[in-house]
A protein has these predicted regions:
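Local sequence-structure signature of Cys/Sec-based thiol-disulfide redox active-site neighborhoods
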Residues: 16-34, 44-46
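A short beta-strand-loop structural module common to alpha/beta enzyme folds
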Residues: 42-52
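Thiol/selenol-based redox catalytic cores and closely related redox-interacting motifs
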Residues: 50-132
Length: 132
């Protein structure tokens, strides 16, 4: 695994050829990491719980991905459920949602893979084969 990357002036790591954000205890993240390793993909590993994404990173990824913002939420997570976000999110602005996501990496759907021109949220092998 190569640990090279370029950090932009504002601290956002978007110049990484590929950054892999995951929670090591998550079985989906483990499966995704095995896929990356088996396919000899170089990436920078980032523990999403210890080093959660910033508002600026999330905003950039959201815009680059073309996905609805709700796709960035870990809707099956305990924190999402305990905060009753299913009912609260529809009334929140995008800015409020992005700020909330940035408060705790466990709110973010994982894994997240970012590259120079793509963002993938969740592990779908067919999509990863196409984009990575």
């Amino acid at each position: 695994m190569t640990k090279w990357y370029r950090t932009l002036k504002n601290g956002i790591i978007l110049g990484v050829r590929m950054q892999f954000l995951c929670y090591p205890k998550c079985s989906t993240c483990q499966k995704a990491q095995k896929w990356l390793d088996a396919n000899k993909k170089e990436y920078k590993f980032r523990n999403i719980k210890e080093n959660n994404p910033t508002v600026d990173e999330l905003t950039a990824w959201y815009k680059m991905s073309g996905l609805p913002l709700k796709k960035f939420f870990n809707t099956s997570g305990l924190l999402y459920k305990s905060l009753n976000l299913k009912d609260k999110l529809p009334a929140m602005s995008e800015d409020e949602q992005l700020k909330l996501l940035a408060t705790d990496g466990m709110l973010v759907k994982r894994p997240v893979v970012t590259g120079d021109d793509f963002v993938l949220v969740g592990f779908r092998e067919s999509e990863w084969k196409e984009k990575i």
